[in-house]
Each structure stands twice: as structure tokens, then as C-alpha cells.
């Protein structure tokens, strides 16, 4: 039986406070899950809602990763900040991928580093 997980990919070039970082990750987790198939979402929930937080150097790599995920048919959510506190409005902060089968997500995230 396949394992299911979700990855949240953050931009290492943005220096966010811990609170802002946590909120952006939460936005991505919820938003990406809304795009998952009902079956994948249920299997992910049953398996404990595994999440992994990874990082990329900049927005360029974040967009490239989103495109790879799209080509694989994975649910994604690219999060833009409202700009009310630390960063300018519209700043793209994180990318949520999944939940989906672990092997599908690993195919495109295997070379990324943990936060």
C-alpha cells in the first residue's frame, strides 16, 4: 500500500519571522489539500497527514517546482502574502504540493533540503 504525504516548499531567500513562516506553511498545507482528489485526501488523513517542509534558494526554483508538479498531475498551491506585516503585498512565499502518493512527490522533491 502506498504512503501519502504533503510537501511544503519554502523560499530560503526570504528571511521571515518564525510566526510569519509558520503561517505561510499553514496556508500552503490547507490550500494544496483543497486541490487533492477525495481519495488521496482520505488516504492521507488515515495515514496521519504526513507533511515535510523543504526549501529552495529562490522564487525561480519555486516556480520550476510548481511546473514539475503540475506536469505530474499533483495538487499544488502557490501562496502570495497579503503584505500587511513583514513583506510586500503579493510576495510569493511558499508552495504546497499534495497530499498525494509519496513516490510521486519524491520524484520531484528528492533533491531538496529539509528546512
Swiss-Prot record:
Location in the cell: Cytoplasm
CC per GO annotation: cytosol
UniProt keyword Coiled coil, yes or no: no
Keywords: Cytoplasm, Hydrolase
Record field: catalytic activity: an N-acyl-L-alpha-aminoacyl-tRNA + H2O = an N-acyl-L-amino acid + a tRNA + H(+)
Any GO MF annotation of the entry: peptidyl-tRNA hydrolase activity
UniProt-listed Gene3D superfamilies: Bit1
The UniProt record lists the keyword Cytoplasm: yes
GO biological process: translation
EC number assigned by the record: 3.1.1.29
Top-level lineage group: Archaea
InterPro entries: Pep_tRNA_hydro_II_dom_sf (IPR023476), Pept_tRNA_hydro_arch (IPR034759), PTH2 (IPR002833)
Protein function: The natural substrate for this enzyme may be peptidyl-tRNAs which drop off the ribosome during protein synthesis.
Family statement drawn from the similarity comment of this UniProt entry: Belongs to the PTH2 family.
HAMAP family: Pept_tRNA_hydro_arch (MF_00628)
Name listed for the protein in its UniProt record: Peptidyl-tRNA hydrolase
Organism phylogeny: Archaea, Methanobacteriati, Methanobacteriota, Stenosarchaea group, Methanomicrobia
GN (gene name): pth
Amino acid at each position: 500500500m502506498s504512503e501519502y504525504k504533503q510537501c511544503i516548499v519554502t523560499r530560503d531567500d526570504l528571511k521571515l519571522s518564525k510566526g510569519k513562516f509558520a503561517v505561510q506553511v499553514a496556508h500552503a498545507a490547507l490550500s494544496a489539500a483543497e486541490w487533492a482528489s477525495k481519495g488521496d485526501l482520505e488516504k492521507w488523513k488515515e495515514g496521519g497527514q504526513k507533511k515535510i517542509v523543504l526549501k529552495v534558494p529562490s522564487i525561480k526554483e519555486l516556480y520550476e517546482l510548481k511546473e514539475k508538479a503540475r506536469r505530474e498531475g499533483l495538487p499544488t498551491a502557490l501562496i502570495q502574502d497579503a503584505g500587511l506585516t513583514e513583506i510586500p503585498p503579493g510576495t510569493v512565499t511558499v508552495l504546497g504540493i499534495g497530499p498525494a502518493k509519496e513516490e510521486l512527490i519524491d520524484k520531484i522533491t528528492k533533491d531538496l533540503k529539509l528546512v
